[in-house]
A protein has these predicted regions:
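Short, flexible loop/turn segments with low-complexity composition
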Residues: 320, 365-369
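Rossmann-fold NAD(P)H-dependent dehydrogenase/reductase core
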Residues: 2-272, 362-366
Length: 369
């Protein structure tokens, strides 16, 4: 899958039988910090990264999830290449699972402080965690009172990024990877379904905690997710702008994995499935099994692992990669255009500023950048 990841010509069959390329995460050993590594494509990426010999720090919501992850990854770590530069090949030397609950900025601040105290440089910071509550009629709230989709998918990630940026800039060929989605763009197939993404003047975020939507409108679960993915791109672009202005260099890669619907009960759609089990089952049957428009978690995980570790042609700057459907069973992973709103520099600066203010007002330590 990832031979020629950067060639713009990577076309993959989307049937369930094709084997993922074993070279997905090959390359010099890197320290990768990953969110959303306990399930879905994040877990698949974590497995491939460990198997390829990289060192992982995976944020976990609580001690129980950290223990479960260790149990899953222990046998995978034993399959790592023999010729590793690490003197200690134990799982404990290659996997750290600090507690950092993305729905609680206090937990994220505590986690970031521990990582900063430890002081280990981060080569690749992978902000991958995300949730969606399709079909929900009422908003859920984070510990600080922000709508939960926005809080987890964007706000906690910006807080983490701002705090850990010094460690990232100390890394080897440092890289930021942010998981977004094609639905951020109202002109794409997924973006056209339901209300489109749109932040307007960020009236809801200006209000602070308690706003159901970033634009100040009434709650809509699908739009909340689309808006959060738009925020991911604006955040990534604004960081790139700030660093360029300061003379700093960083590879900033945002990407869309495509539509990933696992066959089990876990993965990204686990929350939406609880809201509308019949509708989600029907959607999966049509999109995955009949039309074959979906990507498998294994291949999406391989793409994420490759973005985190393989060498891109351009060592610095922002790029957006998308895994787009060409037809039944065929997808192309290539550099793509982001939406018109995602290219709005003024909106990116305002979102960053208001998000940083919201984080600071929640008791977070002063942010870098």
């Amino acid at each position: 899958v990832l031979k020629g990841l950067w060639s713009h010509k990577n076309v993959m069959a989307a049937d369930g039988d094709q084997k993922v390329d074993d070279n997905a995460a090959q390359g010099p050993s890197r320290h990768v910090l990953l969110t959303g590594g306990n399930s879905g494509i994040g877990l698949q990426a974590a497995m491939q990264l460990l198997q390829a010999g990289h060192r992982l720090t995976v944020l976990c919501r609580d001690a129980a999830s950290a223990e479960r992850l260790g149990q899953v990854l222990a046998p995978v770590a034993q399959q790592a290449p023999v010729e590793q530069p690490l003197a200690d090949q134990s799982l404990g030397a290659r996997l750290a699972t600090p507690i950092g609950d993305l729905s609680d900025l206090t937990s994220i601040e505590r986690c970031a402080a521990e990582l900063l105290t430890a002081g280990e440089p981060i080569d690749s910071l992978v902000l991958n965690a995300g949730l969606q509550y399709s079909g929900a009629s009422e908003p859920r709230w984070s510990a600080q009172g922000f709508e939960l989709t926005f809080a987890v998918n964007h706000l906690a990630h910006q807080a983490l990024l701002q705090r850990l940026l010094p460690l990232l800039l100390q890394g080897t060929a440092p890289r930021l990877v942010v998981t977004s989605s094609e639905v951020h763009d109202p002109t794409t197939a997924g973006g056209k379904v339901g209300q489109p993404a749109g932040l307007a003047d960020l009236a809801g975020l200006r209000q602070g905690a308690g706003a159901a939507m970033l634009d100040g409108g009434p709650f809509n679960a699908e739009k909340a997710y689309k808006d959060s993915k738009l925020c991911n791109l604006l955040m990534a672009r604004e960081l790139d702008r700030q660093l360029r202005q300061q003379g700093q260099s960083l590879q900033v890669l945002a990407w869309s994995p495509g539509l990933v619907i696992p066959r089990g009960s876990g993965g990204f759609f686990r929350y939406s499935r609880s809201q509308n089990p019949f509708g989600q089952a029907l959607f999966a049957l049509i999109a995955r099994d009949l039309l074959r428009l979906t990507e498998t978690p294994q291949r999406a995980g391989a793409l994420l692992a490759g973005l985190a570790t393989s060498s891109p042609p351009d060592p610095v700057g922002f790029q957006y990669w998308s895994n787009r459907v060409l037809g039944p069973g065929r997808l192309r992973f290539a550099v793509s255009e982001i939406s018109l709103e995602a290219r709005n520099d003024d909106l990116a600066r305002e979102l960053w500023s208001l998000s940083a203010e919201a984080v600071a007002n929640s008791g977070f330590q002063p942010a870098a950048a």
